[in-house]
UniProtKB/Swiss-Prot annotation:
Family under the similarity heading: Belongs to the rickettsiae OmpA/OmpB family.
All copies of domain Autotransporter, residue ranges: 1368-1656
Membrane found in the keyword field: yes
Name of this chain's protein: Outer membrane protein B
InterPro entries found in the cross-reference section: Autotransporte_beta, Autotransporte_beta_dom_sf, OM_autotransptr_brl_dom, OmpB_passenger_Rickettsia, OmpB_ricketsia
Amino acid sequence: MAQKPNFLKKLISAGLVTASTATIVASFAGSAMGAAIQQNRTTNGVATTVDGVGFDQTVALANVAVAPNAVITANANNGINLNTPAGSFNGLFLSNANNLAVTVSEDTTLGFINNAANNANRFNLTLDAGKTLTITGQGITNVQSAATHNAQNIVAKFNGGAAIANNDLSGLGTIDFGAAASTLVFDLANPTTQKAPLILADNALIVNGANGTLNVTNGFIQVSDKSFATVKAINIGDGQGFMFNTNATNANALNLQAGGTTINFNGTDGTGRLVLLSKNGAATDFNVTGSLGGNLKGIIELNTVAINGQLIANAGPANAVIGTNNGAGRAAGFVVSVDNGKAATIDGQVYAKDMVIQSANANGQVNFRHIVDVGIDGTTAFKTAASIVAITQNSNFGTTDFGNLAAQVTVPDTMTLTGNFTGDANNPGNTAGVITFAANGTLASASADANVAVTNNITAIEASGVGVVQLSGTHTAELRLGNAGSVFKLADGTVINGKVNQTVLVGGVLAAGAITLDGSATITGDIGNGGGGAALQSITLANDATKTLTLGGANIISANGGTINFQANGGTIKLTSTQNNIVVDCDLAIATDQTGVVDASSLTNAQTLTISGTIGIIGANNTTLGQFNIGSSKTTLNGGNVAINELVIGNNGSVQFAHNTYLITRTTNAAGQGKIIFNPVVNNNTTLAAGTNLGSAANPLAEINFGSKGARADTVLNVGEGVNLYATNITTTDANVGSFVFNAGGKNIVSGTVGGQQGNKFNTVALDNGTTVKFLGNATFNGNTTIAANSTLQISGNYTADFIASADGTGIVEFVNTGPINVTLNKQAVPVNALKQITVSGPGNVVVNEIGNAGNYHGAMTDTIAFENSSLGAVLFLPSGIPFNDAGNTIPLTIKSTVGNETAEGFSVPSVIVSGVDSVIADGQVIGDQNNIVGLGLGSDNGIIVNATTLYAGIGTINNNQGTVTLSGGVPNTPGTVYGLGTGIGASKFKQVTFTTDYNNLGNIIATNTTINDGVTVTTGGIAAGGIAGTDFDGKITLGSVNGNANVRFADGIFSNSTSMIVTTKANNGTVTYLGNAFVGNIGDSDTPVASVRFTGSNNGAGLKGNIYSQVIDFGTYNLGIVNSNVILGGSTTAINGKIDLLTNTLTFAGGTSTWGNNTSIETTLTLANGNIGHIVIAEGAQVNATTTGTTTINVQDNANANFSGTQTYTLIQGGARFNGTLGGPNFTVTGSNRFVNYGLIRAANQDYVITRTNNAENIVTNDITNSPFGGAPGVGQNVTTFVNATNTAAYNNLLLAKNSADSANFVGTIVTDTSAAITNAQLDVAKDIQAQLGNRLGALRYLGTPEMVGSEAGAIPAAVAAGDEAVDNVAYGIWAKPFYTDAHQSKKGGLAGYKAKTTGIVIGLDTLANNNLMIGAAIGITKTDIKHQDYKKGDKTDVNGFSFSLYGAQQFVENFFAQGSAIFSLNQVKNKSQRYFFDANGNMSKQIAAGNYDNMTFGGNLTVGYDYNAMQGVLVTPMAGLSYLKSSDENYKETGTTVANKQVNSKFSDRTDLIVGAKVAGGTMNITDFAVYPEVHAFVVHKVTGRLSKTQSVLDGQVTPCISQPDRTAKTSYNLGLSASIRSDAKMEYGIGYDAQIASKYTAHQGTLKVRVNF
């Protein structure tokens, strides 16, 4: 795998730098293995040089150079000159008690420098100008020491055979860089580390450092003398280190980079390390001129583990001491190492890419006196043990890792700490860093990525003093507040994954500080850990309605009086903990009414949410929380008054109110969800402030509950003005506990079932101060209901109480129920205080019951009942024992109404029902009024005596055949007035009604027996207050108490039941008069007829439902309807002068003489069921005189079927011999309702009069068709005859329901005509179009010519080609396509309906030359034809989809003659939709579609001969003549889609032979740009020689003789005119365009074509 380029650079650099070291190591290894002999050379001369002088000599006493890799033992007290170019020696060994000078006069590599033999002395090194000494520190093993040889190659053990360790520089003294530049390199063969560096002792000094360069290329070098700081340049390689642990330059400080010296970091990675060790009693501080590190290189460490120390910028703290303040100028790293009780102070700006703070033991202190900035992608790591870091200026720690150390960063007032801080606080038992702000300050992210947390799993962020600490981004840390004036300010989007004020500050305490928000924020942990200083003073939300504070903790605790503040624009608090109960122990302060949201929507039903503080303000100016969403939690509001604009309760959620005052403007909940609990915990009452709405009409709460009273006497709800309670159930936990107090005025609503659940009743209800309270549901109370100070209790459901009373007599009970309800009260031992009034305002009935036996006093009392608002038709049932004349008071009962009596259904009244007591209604007693009639009723078998002259009431009974009414209110000349007796036919009847005086009863009489005393006249039925109070009569009226001389008069519109009876106590006495329209029951009987029955109205009618026996019956000019099956008229004389409508019934004249006036007519009805007809019977002993009648009409309502033949007869008058007069023409005419029947009247042999009925359908239908658009259709007359003679078809029977001639003609006409001729002609036209396309193709081929045809055989054809042109159709074969569109219109001709046909199609062909004179080809055609039929077939549509196959060819003869022809075979799929009609039972006509789908086959051919004549240059005339034959055949099919008019269609073939004569004229070639254009015009005459269209036969189901289709009436001769142009660009491609017109009598067609051909 290829290495990265920077890796290669490192590899090359390391190889070059360590080449000499590798040589030494390799030589030593080789010596040890016998590959070479290592020398040990000793000095013995004055001048000692490694080239041989001054060293031990050979056997011949000759000097010999010191071999490479040899060890040098200094025995003589003489200096040594290392003058071997690129010399390399294993080491120097001092075996002389003197300091020896070593001169490096050539570049030299040296291993160890040892003074073990004379440790008081050193080698002092001097480097010549430009020379480099490389020290590798390579040691020597004991094996190697024992095997070294001298110059004589004799073993001379080095160091007595003892080893010298690697990196032993104990013999190193001064290093003198001389008067010119030279270099010292530490390139350790066995590199040291920072933990175990190569330490240069105090005797290792630098002389002339200003001329020196010190390179550390391998290993860590620690120096002990300040002189090393004087080296002009110290260069530290990647991964290597240089460490200062020295005496001081001045005082206790070491000056670095003074006088132009520099410390540099070589290499590409910048990982070289400079370590500054504060030394006790020596250099504790480091004064730096300029800055250390840079260009992202160099790691600088300040180590004060031993003693407090400082890193000081000589230019002042406002200057960089580490790196520079731009990205490229930063040091690679900065490390600060401290220990417990020790401090490191950096008095200058720090710019490093990576920073490490480490403490050997906990509580080491690091002080940054100015900016610390690790840059955009820099890092800070806390290691080893916890340390304390104090910054003084804005600082950037970058990505900071606290690990699991309890480290602390302190930030002074107004400063910003930037970074992304990570710890390991999630690891149990670990801590992970604290950031402490002294006062104001900001903690900011160092990352541009908002998803990177600012703090992650650190221990805490602390605000320890007065001031605002600004936070943004995401934090996983605890927030701690150490002063009452401490504030955390959270920017928009801040997330705190941790708690607030749970743990004391580092070195401090918790205090009730505050949190403020600039936008949305999240705090996931608890806030405050109980009372005292750990609780928060306040949380202030952002002043923005769109911002949210999300709280995930279970405890939000504030100090006493602490608040969550919603500013003017609100904001949202969202509670999200779903695992624990939640306590919010603080007030919610609202700045602006109806703003702010508390969102606990995510809470579950397993959680309890407690708000232990006030919410908003209830007062003169309410300030409500905009919305509180409790989710599904159990929420308790128990810490003070609560003002909420909208309380949102999730499914199964509940809210508990305590002893405070609550304003809930509205609740939002799903219907039947949510629960409110009143549970006062300090006293026994809860107060709902004015304007509170719990639940709503659309979405009631599931339950409102009154909690257990506990040790208290009751649980009381004080209800303010305008408070409304909506719940499915309003319950009480304890039986007989829970009282409502409504005393604030205004209106209140209580909706839902109140009490009764599990048998638990509520206690009491109290109304006062003019309050109106509406209970919309059932309510059950054990105690009393009291109403005072003009208050009103509105009841809409069942209501149970001990009693209902008004101490001051001003209380009102108002029933507003829409359905029936029961009010249940207890009987009382003493009287209760009377109500001012009972009002009925709803349409539902009210039953007031009383139970118990405590006494005989009623549970509610009043002297006034009022019907108001929507109570029309309502009924109030009073408790048993309360009469109309006495309600327990000194004055009679007043019954008032303001609701009138008009309804959409007619007259109606509100009613009061009494039972168990008789009543007397006195004259003057207020009951109803003229415009507001009321109803009085009996609920038991008691009586009512009416003494009022005018009673604005109707009277009824609840139980059938119970109750008596005596009407005695009339006075002489002034009849009494009552508004009805009974509620209508079918309702309960009174047992007895008695009229003792004259009366106008402006309503019904519904009584088993009604007696009109002798001499009394009663008029019944009529009009009251603009509406009909009732006109029904059911039961029996007895005229007279003894003598029968009473009179009854029925007002207009009386409706008598068929079982009703009017009888007289004495025969031939008593009169019955009808003043208007009437339905008449039975009057008198054959033994005791009444004196007279007269009908005195004008232009009225009477429906006779019973028999009439009267001395005189005078119908006046009434029209009579016989509405019972057999009505008998018996009496001495009967007068009729109007219409007698018999329907299907029998009218019998039983006796006496009946006279018919000149307006008399008869109507009768013929029924289909039994063939009966209404008729008249003149019994023996009776006679009818009709001698004075004028022309009288007999009309038959014919409901029988007209599907019959011949003539039917029906008896109209039986006993005709007793009919005196002429019945028949000219005095009588007979008409009937069935237009297909002729009616007549004849007299039978027995003199009875008989109606005749003759079928006339054929004539009627024929006439209907003749006068319709179908009348001119050829052959339609015969088809109509065929249709009407097929009387057994469903279509024929359906026709007989037609109401008029137009419907009849349309129904029949669409069946007996068809479109087969049009469809066949259209299909043949399409086949001819395809043949024409083939003919045009053949003509174009001959005209354009080919080389094969040029010559004598081609005749005149080439003459049409312009001079110089070549024939272009010079290929053997080609393929072509011709799309075309045809629009044809055939007008109505010869009576045959026209059509419009539009055809789109394409013909695709392939042709070739069979030989020089014969061309043949084949083609397929695809077509679609849409036919819309016209005239009397308008609305019919046909679609034809065709596919054809054709063969075509042309033969060239001699002398310019030719023949051409084609054969075609096509298959067509036809979809035909024809209109039909259908009549329902009432003769209403609807349109239906008969669909016919079938296949058609068409085939044929044509042959044409012609002659080409060259009329002139460029013009070719071709006369032509020929024949064409086509044959078409349809398959048989059955229509679908109609109810009665589907036809079976059978077809035969159609064919035609046409003679074709015409000519074509071809013009010369026209060259247009690169195209050759060949024009052509033609004209042909096509004449039909022979052929016929199929006579299609069609039958309906059940029809035997078929209908025949209309013959073809289209023109035989047509004319074709056309023109075309062929266009060629080359021999391969040909294009064309053409137009043709077809013209015939009443027919035109236009066709357009395109052409494309590809020649091969």
